[in-house]
Amino acid sequence: MTEQTTSPTLPKPGQPIVFRNGTVVTVDDTRSVLADTDVLIVGQNIEAIGRGLAVPDGTFEIDATGGIVMPGMIDTHRHMWQTAMRGYGADWTLTQYFVWYYLEHGKSFRPEDVYAGNKLSALDALDAGVTTTVDWSHGLRTLEHGEAALDALTSSDGRYVLAYGNIFNGPWE
């Protein structure tokens, strides 16, 4: 028996999108939560929120039944370059973290390692509903490391602020 898979259909650039029948968290002044509600997006704007919305011809429809529709979240403190070492040292003290991440492992990171960590972290954030991130990129040894971090972010969907930091000028010196 062979299993056949199909790629999901994605909206075309500029195509209007409507989320149908979701639980909508509005984050407006009333902090409304609306059940079984549609959200119409045209371009980068939310054009309408309501039940049974009439939409333009050719609108891409997403069935949001059982799901939550809300604006993207903001993460103001993420060390994206460290994603490549996720879970490593999870039981360390803060002192061990500084010594091993910075003085041992962090200093062996190449620009391509920083790129991989930032790219993976960007994808991970988007998968969790985070669309804006401040990257506390304090493990950068050279300009090339900084450029790799920036390249990973600019080639990823989402919004990012790169908070550049140099590993050689840590608080322990």
Indicate residue ranges for each PLM-predicted region.
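Active-site-proximal flexible loops/turns
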Residues: 28, 70, 82-86, 142, ...
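Active-site loop-helix segments enriched in His/Asp/Glu that coordinate
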Residues: 108-173
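Flexible loop residues that form catalytic
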Residues: 27, 79, 138
